[in-house]
Amino acid sequence: MTYVLDLKRSFLDACTWLIGDNFRDLGSVLWVPLPILSLVIVATLGVLVIVWLERKISAGVQQRVGPEYGGALGLLQPLADGLKLVFKEDVVPAKSDTWLFTLGPAVVVIPIFLAYLVVPFGQQLIIADLRIGIFFWIAISSIAPIGLLMSGYGSNNKYSFLGGLRAAAQSISYELPLAICVLSVCLLADSLSTVDIVESQSSWGILTWNIWRQPIGFVAFLIAALAECERLPFDLPEAEEELVAGYQTEYTGMKFGLFYVGSYVNLLVSGCFVTVLYLGGWHGPFAIDGILPDSPPFQVLDAFLGITWTLLKTFLFLFAAILTRWTLPRVRIDQLLDLGWKFLLPVSLGNLLLTASLKLLF
């Protein structure tokens, strides 16, 4: 399509129509926090959906019913969980480092929300189309383990401290293969922009998605993403049988709730980047660019379809991640590190070399 839906221009035009030309600058000021606020609300609602899916899928795997009393099909159960955490007492251990103990959850959650700045839900449906958007995500996601280490050390608890150390070791081990797999995709797209990466997969629909051009990188990225999210079988930093609850052991109330939200938001953003890098982003399986007329109603339809396809692909990844959690056993810490350093890192480097060689030849 030649013209795409520009939300900012549409918002400013609506402000001009409602309150006059003299207040167009006011509309520009109001626009600044609006996308960020909308994204935070949508991400939080996404967490509620994931929590409900986790409960229902785990119940299906274990042949149970799952939540059914909290509203229709148990849809209000995640909301009840959140309200319960809000009203719990916020306990700070007596001999803990209060500053580190308090700042830790915020340092974990804030970078995860910032990653949504570069997630495209459509050609213009992105908050910040940075030229280095994909590496902005990798850089910003590397901050979260620092918060986990702060939380573990500040708790003055041996189990919490060990959980924080495990989180740091796990992040370092799997950040490298993750970044190298991303670099292979960027070589194919000739860009580090998330929008350009999606556009490079739009020529022939599903046939040009990077999952077919980068099958090795896709599998390596999938494993590394699950490890970065600390999902089973890679949840060593909070292994109940070994570390009680890891770095979360001393936390209660909303501070514990921040870890809870951060874990699921991180899983959601990882699903978004799997979609962007390997599954064609907002594009459907069939190439329809240029088919729809260039009129405002069809621009809105195109934007709606883009958001729908992005969310469908993202929740497909989430379904696989949840199913993996309830079907595979936890690995040992030595197996976790061996998988990262002795398997994924050489495989991702070989995939990068192969991609660069084919790029030079063809």
Curated annotation (Swiss-Prot):
One of its GO terms (cellular component) is chloroplast thylakoid membrane. InterPro entries: NADH_UbQ_OxRdtase_su1/FPO (IPR001694), NADH_UbQ_OxRdtase_su1_CS (IPR018086). The keyword Membrane applies. Keywords: Chloroplast, Membrane, NAD, NADP, Plastid, Plastoquinone, Quinone, Thylakoid, Translocase, Transmembrane, Transmembrane helix. It is found in: Plastid, Chloroplast thylakoid membrane. The chain crosses the membrane at residues 31-51, 99-119, 132-152, 178-198, 206-226, 268-288, 303-323, 336-356. The keyword Transport does not apply. GO terms for molecular function: NADH dehydrogenase activity; oxidoreductase activity, acting on NAD(P)H, quinone or similar compound as acceptor; quinone binding. It is an enzyme of class 7 (translocase). It is a multi-pass membrane protein. It catalyses: a plastoquinone + NADH + (n+1) H(+)(in) = a plastoquinol + NAD(+) + n H(+)(out); a plastoquinone + NADPH + (n+1) H(+)(in) = a plastoquinol + NADP(+) + n H(+)(out). Belongs to the complex I subunit 1 family. NDH is composed of at least 16 different subunits, 5 of which are encoded in the nucleus. This is NAD(P)H-quinone oxidoreductase subunit 1, chloroplastic. It comes from Nephroselmis olivacea. The lineage of its organism: Eukaryota, Viridiplantae, Chlorophyta, Nephroselmidophyceae, Nephroselmidales. The gene is ndhA.
